[in-house]
Amino acid sequence: MEEVMPIIQVEMLKGRTLEQKRALAEKVTQAVVETANCPKEAVRIIIREMDFENFAQGGVLKCDENK
């Protein structure tokens, strides 16, 4: 059976530190390794950060939340 590498995409608002992103990558990788039974080298993670003006919840842009 051909091994298919898992690609995980994480979308979140800007503001996390580099250390937080490292920790996220490590923990997500470990979870995928344990559940998908694949080597950690096969796990790919894409982190996409959004500006606060590009995310809305309940019809309100995140940048307008506290106005």
Model region roles, listed by residue range:
Residues E2-K67:
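A domain-level signal for the structural core that forms small-molecule/cofactor-binding pockets
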